[in-house]
């Protein structure tokens, strides 16, 4: 199996699908984690978006491009909301909605009236830079003191993803690519490969966020139980004396 763009795309799709399945299994056990529900839905939407890329050879390209990018935008918004929910920070609905709407509108403009693969890739890269930077900023700015380790590690992963897409903004698209993303050239291939590794790292970062949050909750519950026993101990001793 040669390591070309279509092969790596298939591997990336299988990876995203496996991560989505794994988070779904976690959700069966950790049903009380609202952020996990949002992240799981986001990962399934990401896998659906990549499915639309794989089907472009069998179905009309223009509707699939619009559908895939709309689903991708919704996936990013849910991931963003999941981070805000994990940090217990309010996030006005209109802010990510405006960002996602502007992204989808840009894709529609450069796939229907003015088809241009290079501009579409730049629009997608700019959207990814903004969303990942937003999540990294929230994790650094609003990290609870007892959860800073996992929040800062996750922020580093999101920041690395933002850097990759920022670099992609300046990379050229192969002149003979036309409207085919699989022929975009070696520089785009390199950023896609880096994105696969960062997607795996993001999966572990999200799990670390959940684990540290549960550890903090367990320590808090243990302290509460200890205080409760300490308060009850004198009355219990008096009852023994009686």
Where are the regions a protein language model picked out?
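Interdomain coupling helix/linker and adjacent catalytic-core signature
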Residues: 223-242
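Hydrophobic transmembrane alpha-helical segments in integral membrane proteins
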Residues: 1-19
